[in-house]
């Protein structure tokens, strides 16, 4: 744990609090900004039912409803995935009017399709929210529903956010829930789950070959394994290069790459029925997997395509506080100042 003086020193390090010139033209949250969303539609290559095929690596992006099994066939064709990573919308504007019963029924439909599209031995990861002001829904009923599905539960992972929403009468909410299930008996690459956090706790002595050794000597790595509580994943916010403005609750590239590294091999097919900001697509590209992804919204399909093209062209993971449609729509959607102080900078200085 860093001392207060160390945190201050890190916060004042060159580049951390430096107000470097940053493109400050973000898109507003698209699920609650219908006017902006409508402006972006003419620039989208896909319409409902359309499929974009990547000629270089074989990735495919389809504009379809994840709960429509017939439409999904146009995305996967004869492919079978060894890994599925789903981040279904659970707190976006479009779902605020759905009852929990309707939401779970919708989840059952795309999960049934997912099971059929997975290989005999495959892994499934689902990101889901747990609203502590609403009986921990939809996570609570989702987990009960999964007990009736043919998947086998393997782990309940918590990702710790650096920021959260708090109250004077409750614990601050800083967790994200990630459920891990399997079909059959898929391999698990332990090397893929090692973090960059160095091992500092010594002890746990054990005699091996007549020699008394402690745990660090016996380990094959000088860093710790992730376990099922991840504290080393930086929550995406506007000053990160990977930020894709307009995409609410964007998942970090690092956590997605960790999942792909642990639960698939190079050349495998990775399935994602909720493309959103294109994080799974980009992670698969970087780790030499083939991604089959979809989104019901043509705008998010286009953002995913452009993010892949942007990465190949520039090596950058996102647009920071700019956006994917600036060539077509250069006008500012935000009145924030380029000189606004970065409130996250001090939070970034702490490891946890």
Residue spans for each PLM region:
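S-adenosyl-L-methionine
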Residues: 50-73, 311-340
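Core catalytic lobe of class I
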Residues: 1-32, 38-294, 298-302, 351-352
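C-terminal cap/substrate-recognition subdomain and adjoining C-terminal extension
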Residues: 341-342, 346, 352
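Short functional hotspots where side chains directly engage DNA or cofactors
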Residues: 303, 307
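Conserved hydrophobic residues forming the short capping helix/wall of the S-adenosyl-L-methionine
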Residues: 146, 308, 312
């Amino acid at each position: 744990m860093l001392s207060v003086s160390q945190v201050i020193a890190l916060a004042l390090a060159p580049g951390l609090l430096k107000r470097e010139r940053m493109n400050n033209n973000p898109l507003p949250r698209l699920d609650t900004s219908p006017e902006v969303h409508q402006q972006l539609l003419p620039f989208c290559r896909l319409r409902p039912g359309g499929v974009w095929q990547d000629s270089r690596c074989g990735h495919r992006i389809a504009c379809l409803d994840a709960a429509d099994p017939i439409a999904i066939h146009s995305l996967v064709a004869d492919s079978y995935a060894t890994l599925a990573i789903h981040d279904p919308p659970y707190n976006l504007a479009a779902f605020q009017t759905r009852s929990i019963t309707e939401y779970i029924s919708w989840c059952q439909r795309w999960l049934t399709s997912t099971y059929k599209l997975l290989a005999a031995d495959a892994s499934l990861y689902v990101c889901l929210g747990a609203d502590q002001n609403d009986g921990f829904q939809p996570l609570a009923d989702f987990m009960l529903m999964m007990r009736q599905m043919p998947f086998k539960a393997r782990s309940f992972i918590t990702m710790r956010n650096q920021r959260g929403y708090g109250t004077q009468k409750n614990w601050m909410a800083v967790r994200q829930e990630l459920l891990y299930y399997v079909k059959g008996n898929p391999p698990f690459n332990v090397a893929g789950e090692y973090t960059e956090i160095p091992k500092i706790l010594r002890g746990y002595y054990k005699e091996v070959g007549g020699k008394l050794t402690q745990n660090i000597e016996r380990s094959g790595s000088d860093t710790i394994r992730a376990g099922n509580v991840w504290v080393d994943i930086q929550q995406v916010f506007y000053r990160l290069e990977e930020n894709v403005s307009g995409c609410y609750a964007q998942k970090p590239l690092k956590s997605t790459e960790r999942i792909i590294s642990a639960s698939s091999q190079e050349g495998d097919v990775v399935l994602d029925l909720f493309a959103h900001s294109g994080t799974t697509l980009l992670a698969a590209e970087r780790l030499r997997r083939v991604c089959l992804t979809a989104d019901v919204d043509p705008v998010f399909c286009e953002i995913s395509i452009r993010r892949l093209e942007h990465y190949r062209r520039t090596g950058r993971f996102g647009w920071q506080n700019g956006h994917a449609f600036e060539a077509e729509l250069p006008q500012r959607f935000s009145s924030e100042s380029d000189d606004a102080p970065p409130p996250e900078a001090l939070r970034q200085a702490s490891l946890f």
